[in-house]
Amino acid sequence: MSTRATRPGMLHQKENAADAQAGKRQRTAAGSAARAPLSANAAPPAPDPAIEFAGRDDVDALLNEKMKGKNKMDYKGKSEQMMEYIKKLRACIKWLLEREDTNLAEIGKLNGLLEAAEKHHSEIVAQLKSAIEESKAINEELQRQYASLEENLKRVEAEKLDALRSYGDEKEARIAVEASRNEHLEDLRRIKLEEKRLNDQIKMLQDTNKRLQEYNTSLQQYNSNLQADATKNGETIAKLQKEKNTMVETMNGLKDHANSVKMQLDLAKSSQNEALKQKTDLLKEVDNLRGELQQVRDDRDHKLAEIHSLLADVSTYKEMTGKSVAELDNAMTRSTALEETCSSQAERIKTLELQLASANEKLKRSDLTTMETMTEYEKQKRMLEDLQLRLEEAEQQILDGENLRKRLHNTILELKGNIRVFCRVRPLLPNESGAVAYPKSGENLGRGIELTHNAQMYSFTFDKVFEQSASQEDVFIEISQLIQSALDGYKVCIFAYGQTGSGKTYTMMGNPELHDQKGLIPRSLEQIFQTSQALISQGWKYKMQASMLEIYNEAIRDLLATNRTTVQDGGASKYSIKHDANGNTHVSDLTIVDVSSINEVSSLLKRAAQSRSVGRTQMNEESSRSHCVFTLRIFGVNEGTDQQVQGVLNLIDLAGSERLNKSGATGDRLKETQAINKSLSCLSDVIFSIAKKEEHVPFRNSKLTYLLQPCLGGDSKTLMFVNLSPEVSSTGESICSLRFAARVNSCEIGIPRRQTQVRSLAQG
């Protein structure tokens, strides 16, 4: 049980044995340099035995520790702290070396056990084959002996006939036959025992083989469990997506209701404003009426005073002058008219007061309705905020689940060593009709694509499928982690494949002048420079070198050469491709430029774009007539840990495959088309050989495949974009591209290795 339980770990240790041995050599070199005397007269002080490290957190805490003094001039305090910090660093290095020695010893022990087990298994298989061959030989010998016995029996019968004629001869023959029979019976018994022993041995070997098969099955089950976990996470993501959709629908309903309530509130506010306006008008009118009433009252009082004055005058007149009754009646008439005017004014005042009370009542009802509407609006607003919060949580869960699925998927792909494949479909032009569809749900959502050709449906599944509506930003987000790997010390290769006019150059380069239309190459370089600047605070310093070439008619051209004549004419013969022992690719005499900012790289890309070969065909106004390869070499060193990394980023825009009957190529365009199709055919042959795991892979059949050899047959992280045209007339070519992409997706090229080492003191 313990042997089987440790075998997966042993296999894992075996896969990383090469890395462990390389790391051991690097550690030995670094360790010997680190243990070299720092001066001719003094050895470094021994690490403090009281300093202990429990794990990586303690090491990180030590590396993040900052020197603090009482003030800027406290050099003695800082020096003491620095000496204590150096002691801790020495203790940390010693602990790391001891831990690495322990790990290496354990790895060596496990490798020894694994080799012994494999050797024992080989011996058992050889013994089994030998036993089977021996058993066959024994069976043949037994058959020959049986035939011999039959012949002897016939001979004995003949001798018996002869014995009838001679008793003496019969007796001797009988004795001889009995003796021979006993010998043969003994031989037969021995043969049966030997056969039983061999059968037992065969059974034991079969049991051993069965246990090995069970162990292999357990490894396959382990891989299946990883895939099942990935599937389960996918189902969880789909469930969360469904819940998100439900919440979005609910939120949309609430938004509609909130909008309705808001409209009602706006109407209520409008009514309230109208009522307030009416109230203001009524108040103004009441004030006017009150002023008029006061004026009427004043007039009435004035008239009454006049009446009293007239009455007094009448009395006076009667008494003093004895005026006529007619004059008195006239004065009385005037007095009555004034009294009627006062009465009508009083009635109007009462009417205005009633109108004022009614307006106040309407205003109160309007205020109450407004308060109720505001309360309902606040309630709906809180509910909407709650749903919005729940929606954000669900979206975060979906995002976390998607990130987990991506990590698991990437882990599985790295364990399998497969080339990743992304599919991107360009938008339809106004005069085109589409033949592409996508799964709307299920595990293939976002990963599947369906094409209809001649009334038949073709379905394909890749690591990611981008629909026509996907932006350049959406595409780059999916590969940003892969770009980060180049800074971490990995070799990364991304190339675009597809028929002419399918959007490869737009995907890789885009329009660098417009932010929304920038392609993968400028966006990748922006991320690398931004991240490298951010890592300066952690002690990292990076040096970067850029180069760019094209393969035109099976000839290499340097796109960064300062002399454009060299680019366009026959200077390509001096460029040769070489691969070193570490899997790094070099092109002789190629222009390599040191770059330190995105602006420098942008100017290089502009210069290269002006030199690249493009031409007009019936299928594309600006068709790329060559394969373009941009390479960025990254050299990083951490001043604090002396760790060095070396990464390579290859971004490749392949020329598009095209059919002569559609492109209408003639003359130079015909020659270019033939060269492009030939190199892409060689690439297809290489992929086919890798997929079939053939011993010989024809990398040297073309410049393109030989240049891509480390990416397709080495330890690189490789991603292919297959670009498609969605129009109906291109479905045949699109299906060919998708079949090629599916074959690429199934290729296992090995687990990517990180290029890192520890810098020696001499280098420092």
Swiss-Prot record:
Carries keyword Coiled coil? yes
The protein's superkingdom reads Eukaryota
Which InterPro entries has this protein been placed in? Kinesin-like_fam, Kinesin_motor_CS, Kinesin_motor_dom, Kinesin_motor_dom_sf, P-loop_NTPase
The GO molecular function terms of this record are: ATP binding; ATP hydrolysis activity; microtubule binding; microtubule motor activity
Listed Low complexity bias regions: 29-50
Q: Which residues form a coiled coil?
A: 105-416
Occurrences of domain Kinesin motor (ranges): 418-747
Q: Which GO terms describe its cellular component?
A: cytoplasm; kinesin complex; microtubule
Pfam families attached to this UniProt entry: Kinesin
Q: Which SMART domains match?
A: KISc
Q: Name one GO biological process term.
A: spindle assembly
Positions of the UniProt region annotated as Disordered: 1-50
UniProt keywords, alphabetically: ATP-binding, Coiled coil, Microtubule, Motor protein, Nucleotide-binding
**Where, by residue number, does ATP bind?**
G498, Q499, T500, G501, S502, G503, K504, T505
User: Could you say which protein family the record assigns here?
Assistant: Belongs to the TRAFAC class myosin-kinesin ATPase superfamily. Kinesin family. KIN-14 subfamily.
Stated name of the protein: Kinesin-like protein KIN-14N
Please give the organism. Answer: Oryza sativa subsp. japonica
